[in-house]
């Protein structure tokens, strides 16, 4: 009888094929914690409905509104409190990259192959280093940029194919509808928050000065913030404040974007840095 421990991983992507920064978010946990975790997130969303009278809707970072703002704050509290436990039953890992760095700023870059390579890095980090050995079931958002049915279990990482079954013990890859899967929605939230924190860091600093009623030492021109960005700044500020209060080891200012210096932490924001001059994205 196979007694290997089973784990689940839920992923979504942010800003694929647009913008300077791209990311993949992954929520992972032992399979036996899945029902409790999903139940807790659904209860959080229902509580927002009960408290506000607002209609429940799918969480999407690119469609921010009052309901989603309130839900995100409660989700932040929930995951930070879980992560503060001695042996957290869940991880959130976000891999972000910059298409204008030395690795990606090349002619003929193949974004689809590059995304597959980034999934490989994420799998390698989370599956191989962050959890005990075991088997995995993987649930990506069906609207993601990788056609998992076509890829099957073989990621193309540029001239070679990686067998996910053999290397990472991934038993199944089932694309799911994010509308029906709250953990994919959570992965979307953290991936979107990561990209936003890097892309809009300068504006976030300006907004923060305005919120605190402070004057900059060096004055800047008046900046207009969109209503949606103001809501996202509020979420980013809340997340940053709660991380500091709970000593979560997540930094915002140091790298001008969310970053976790110790990747073993159960909420891990990771910005991919080129490993050498020879580290280049695949080309078409």
From Swiss-Prot:
This is Uncharacterized protein ORF2'. It comes from Methanothermobacter thermautotrophicus (Methanobacterium thermoformicicum). InterPro entries: DUF3800. Keywords: Plasmid.
